[in-house]
Amino acid sequence: MSVAKSIAAVLVALLPGALAQANTSYVDYNVEANPNLTPQSVATIDLSFPDCENGPLSKTLVCDTSARPHDRAAALVSMFTFEELVNNTGNTSPGVPRLGLPPYQVWSEALHGLDRANFTDEGEYSWATSFPMPILTMSALNRTLINQIATIIATQGRAFNNVGRYGLDVYAPNINAFRSAMWGRGQETPGEDAYCLASAYAYEYITGIQGGVDPEHLKLVATAKHYAGYDLENWDGHSRLGNDMNITQQELSEYYTPQFLVAARDAKVHSVMCSYNAVNGVPSCANSFFLQTLLRDTFGFVEDGYVSSDCDSAYNVWNPHEFAANITGAAADSIRAGTDIDCGTTYQYYFGEAFDEQEVTRAEIERGVIRLYSNLVRLGYFDGNGSVYRDLTWNDVVTTDAWNISYEAAVEGIVLLKNDGTLPLAKSVRSVALIGPWMNVTTQLQGNYFGPAPYLISPLNAFQNSDFDVNYAFGTNISSHSTDGFSEALSAAKKSDVIIFAGGIDNTLEAEAMDRMNITWPGNQLQLIDQLSQLGKPLIVLQMGGGQVDSSSLKSNKNVNSLIWGGYPGQSGGQALLDIITGKRAPAGRLVVTQYPAEYATQFPATDMSLRPHGNNPGQTYMWYTGTPVYEFGHGLFYTTFHASLPGTGKDKTSFNIQDLLTQPHPGFANVEQMPLLNFTVTITNTGKVASDYTAMLFANTTAGPAPYPNKWLVGFDRLASLEPHRSQTMTIPVTIDSVARTDEAGNRVLYPGKYELALNNERSVVLQFVLTGREAVIFKWPVEQQQISSA
């Protein structure tokens, strides 16, 4: 029997479910956006631990806690037969029964709470805390909050893992930048800014999940995804599984990968997921430039960090990309390029044939499996009850601290887009009309990638549990064109002091495998809002969902008194919205995306990856958009007023020689360009009557270096907690050397001599100018892209 046939027989015997279903249907993935994959679920395998006390491995090096993790993993893998080795190259690994090595599931989810866990029906381990979607959390501009959320998720994940109900590797965070306003998964990301926001989110989330910066004992393994150039699902029939994204070296370096550099170099992420799409003709999971030249040789990916394919993307290297001549070649191309573990069954089914045909070697396959098990060693998988996190239990899941932080994230992220003084509601308001498809929601609060929550508070729930008299009417559905519910809605509005409409978009319109074709309010929601606005009563609109919709008609309608963006606010979302509306809490979130006018979606194809304006493309993201947005990136109103001023010493340095900057000592920093160029320090005074948090975005702009020039770019952000009226507080935002560099056409980060400007927020409340002198200098060298591996 050949090696290939032997492996297939073993797989069918061990895993009669998912792994007995190889991809032989040959779906047309050029138009189908979902992989034909039925992965083994956590619920159907035994997630126990190896017995290093009395089991077959107890006397081997893998159970020796004094040995190096790599050596322990290598010793384990060296004991595998070839068939056993191949069996353990997929996300659903059967382990090695003869060695007492249990099955293992690589694929767990932790985007904003536990998902793909084996939840019980009731009682212990039946739920986990559900935080807001990342797009809303990032809008809070609070680094500490991101880290707290990730830390809690990791704690709860380890508690579930200790009873065999969750894995130790999580497919999170999603750090792709939200470039296209129509992208269905933009809700999962930290917004449209790659260099500053996505990178900061990556750092805080990864270090929270993993328990620090490359700790000796990993808490969980985070997976930075999707690497790289992935930001469409199925736009106009262009499937994510077959998209070939044409990206210049300049924008690949400037926009599509800097967050992955931070994830690898600074946060020391231990796993990276290669994406479905191809870039410049090469599928990401078969792209040695991405996975070796950039990730490992340039970005400094940890030595035993492993690359996981997105689910079935190794198969997609053949179908639909046709980069490889057949599925066996796709498996060989992917492993040789640096994709260590296959989320799917392609490796498990086709490595035998690839080995027989001498397209792969045992050493190439071992490399990936050793990397996976090195991380499991670092996670304490082989350490028995002595594992650092083995004492976490259900009691560590049931904590009001986690619930409070979920609520806090929702409150801090909510953005006040428009307000004429109607909010916060006056004390005299007694009755409210609650209308719209988002008013009485449950799991819709959670967005996507979620598990059961301990509770879900809808806006209707929250108001019903307050002192208001509530008149509720559904009104209309998200995408409905029926007006059958209008009369009931108008009736409820007429007998109320204030009208609140909650609508927008949801996961029926934006989701994984689903992009929008427009950025307008769907259905007849605007028609109903317009009729409500004619009743002569205060009207508040809650615009919900991850992506933005064109709310220009609401912005210009004087009878729409207030407009709030609430994202997907999680388990306490309704309470958070109530508390903002009533003034118990004050809004301070800022948009981390641009709200474009509706015609933007029709001007150029979403598959155009170029950010810089050209042809019919008016430019993408706040950095390059040449049109007039409905609401700018960074927009957000307060219930109070603030005054920002420089301390005024007049002694701060405003001229810097480039060569002096780059030759100075840099203790505490791995690279000199990570050092602060200057500290932007301002005094913030609450000049109004309401206590409020204050949020700031610091932008840079220049005409130094070659044209075209971006409008501006984000170099820092911060949040001050609860500033009382007439009180002042100092805020300092470090501006690093790297943050004022620009990217040349070859992808290099360059410091150019010339005049620069730093401006606080969109309103430019404080402006600081400085000059760089000397000679231009490359501070980050983008490696020359070479020919990729030849297809097998």
Curated annotation (Swiss-Prot):
Record: glycosylation sites: 23, 87, 118, 142, 246, 326, 385, 404, 440, 477, 518, 679, 701
Transmembrane segments: none
Keyword Nucleotidyltransferase in annotation: no
Enzyme superclass (EC): hydrolase
Pfam families per record: Fn3-like, Glyco_hydro_3, Glyco_hydro_3_C
One function term, GO molecular function aspect: alpha-L-arabinofuranosidase activity
GO BP annotations listed: arabinan catabolic process; xylan catabolic process
RNA-binding as UniProt keyword: no
Function according to Swiss-Prot or TrEMBL: Xylan 1,4-beta-xylosidase involved in the hydrolysis of xylan, a major structural heterogeneous polysaccharide found in plant biomass representing the second most abundant polysaccharide in the biosphere, after cellulose.
Protein name: Probable exo-1,4-beta-xylosidase xlnD
